[in-house]
């Protein structure tokens, strides 16, 4: 069953200031919670394009959103190809785009997908199950140096070298096949006092491998850069991030977009072409309420950032 607790549901969609006849994009369809709430605000002229690279998510969303079938188009693609996919369908500009960058709970919870360090399964971790690169390939074939790099950069793991060394030692004996084996390796590599602190010892390493398998950070950067070029004046982008790496990328891109070009010295009035094209809709990121956190603990690290294209 495809259950998914939508995070910052109202805030994310409401911050788009939805026009009933507007064209919108849900870049991360997932459990379709944001899509359903947004579709509810559209009239017959309005339309939503919903992206997901996971066919299971699309199949479930089609059932969930059956009442809105004439107002929604489902596109099976990584959101980094959003602009191309929309252009192919004759869409050059949109009124709003939303991103929920969390891994949807069903993917984490389905044992056979191999995302979870709580359940033993084949090492997979692919969002798009048609792609070739899997967690098993990363763990067994990537070099010691590459493993250290991803564990440190994507997992912010202090014990990257120790974990990479233990992986290298084990895979020389036989291939590492399952998430359970990987958890055992991580527990062996991390010193006992550190294992007892800060949640599950596999959390950071699993995050790093998942990001590497799906090129998540590259996709976020590509997609957001293109999303900014798709917005109509007055249009907005809402982005929910769940860890510091994605939040850093989003924050940096938004800050850069809200800067105008460098001004020549001594101008009495700033000409329009020197004014920025974008502004931040909120000075600080929006975070979940205490009430939401009580309902859904996975929302704890969520941050919502919103940018608007200025009408000139």
From Swiss-Prot:
<dbReference type="InterPro" id="IPR002903">
    <property type="entry name" value="RsmH"/>
</dbReference>
<feature type="binding site">
    <location>
        <position position="100"/>
    </location>
    <ligand>
        <name>S-adenosyl-L-methionine</name>
    </ligand>
</feature>
<feature type="binding site">
    <location>
        <position position="107"/>
    </location>
    <ligand>
        <name>S-adenosyl-L-methionine</name>
    </ligand>
</feature>
<keyword id="KW-0489">Methyltransferase</keyword>
<feature type="binding site">
    <location>
        <begin position="32"/>
        <end position="34"/>
    </location>
    <ligand>
        <name>S-adenosyl-L-methionine</name>
    </ligand>
</feature>
<keyword id="KW-0963">Cytoplasm</keyword>
<dbReference type="InterPro" id="IPR029063">
    <property type="entry name" value="SAM-dependent_MTases_sf"/>
</dbReference>
<comment type="similarity">
    <text>Belongs to the methyltransferase superfamily. RsmH family.</text>
</comment>
<keyword id="KW-0808">Transferase</keyword>
<feature type="binding site">
    <location>
        <position position="52"/>
    </location>
    <ligand>
        <name>S-adenosyl-L-methionine</name>
    </ligand>
</feature>
<protein>
    <recommendedName>
        <fullName>Ribosomal RNA small subunit methyltransferase H</fullName>
        <ecNumber>2.1.1.199</ecNumber>
    </recommendedName>
</protein>
<keyword id="KW-0698">rRNA processing</keyword>
<dbReference type="GO" id="GO:0071424">
    <property type="term" value="F:rRNA (cytosine-N4-)-methyltransferase activity"/>
</dbReference>
<dbReference type="GO" id="GO:0005737">
    <property type="term" value="C:cytoplasm"/>
</dbReference>
<comment type="function">
    <text>Specifically methylates the N4 position of cytidine in position 1402 (C1402) of 16S rRNA.</text>
</comment>
<feature type="binding site">
    <location>
        <position position="79"/>
    </location>
    <ligand>
        <name>S-adenosyl-L-methionine</name>
    </ligand>
</feature>
<dbReference type="Pfam" id="PF01795">
    <property type="entry name" value="Methyltransf_5"/>
</dbReference>
<dbReference type="InterPro" id="IPR023397">
    <property type="entry name" value="SAM-dep_MeTrfase_MraW_recog"/>
</dbReference>
<dbReference type="GO" id="GO:0070475">
    <property type="term" value="P:rRNA base methylation"/>
</dbReference>
<keyword id="KW-0949">S-adenosyl-L-methionine</keyword>
């Amino acid at each position: 069953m495809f259950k998914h607790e939508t995070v910052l549901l109202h805030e994310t969609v409401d911050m788009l200031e939805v026009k009933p006849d507007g064209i919108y994009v849900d870049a991360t369809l997932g459990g379709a919670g944001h899509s359903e709430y947004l579709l509810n605000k559209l009239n017959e002229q309005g339309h939503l394009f919903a992206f997901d690279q996971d066919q299971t998510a699309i199949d479930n969303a089609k059932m969930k959103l059956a009442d809105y079938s004439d107002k929604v188009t489902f596109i099976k693609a990584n959101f980094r190809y959003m602009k191309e996919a929309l252009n192919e369908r004759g869409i050059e500009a949109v009124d709003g785009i939303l991103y929920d960058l969390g891994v949807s709970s069903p993917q984490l919870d389905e044992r056979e997908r191999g995302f979870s360090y709580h359940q033993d399964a084949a090492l997979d971790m692919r969002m798009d199950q048609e792609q070739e690169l899997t967690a098993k390939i990363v763990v067994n074939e990537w070099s010691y140096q590459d493993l250290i790099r991803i564990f440190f950069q994507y997992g912010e793991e202090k014990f990257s070298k120790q974990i990479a060394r233990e992986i290298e030692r084990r895979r020389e004996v036989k291939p590492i096949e399952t998430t359970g084996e990987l958890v055992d390796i991580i527990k062996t590599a991390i010193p006992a006092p550190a294992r007892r602190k800060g949640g599950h010892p596999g959390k950071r390493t699993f995050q790093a491998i998942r990001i590497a398998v799906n090129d998540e950070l590259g996709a976020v950067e590509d997609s957001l850069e293109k999303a900014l070029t798709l917005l109509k004046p007055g249009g907005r982008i809402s982005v929910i991030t769940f860890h510091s790496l994605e939040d850093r990328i989003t924050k940096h891109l938004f800050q850069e977009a809200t800067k105008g070009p460098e001004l020549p010295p001594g101008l009495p009035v700033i000409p329009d072409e020197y004014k920025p094209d974008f502004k931040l809709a909120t000075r600080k990121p929006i975070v979940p309420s205490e009430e939401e956190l009580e309902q859904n603990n996975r929302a704890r690290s969520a941050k919502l950032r919103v940018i608007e294209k200025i009408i000139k």
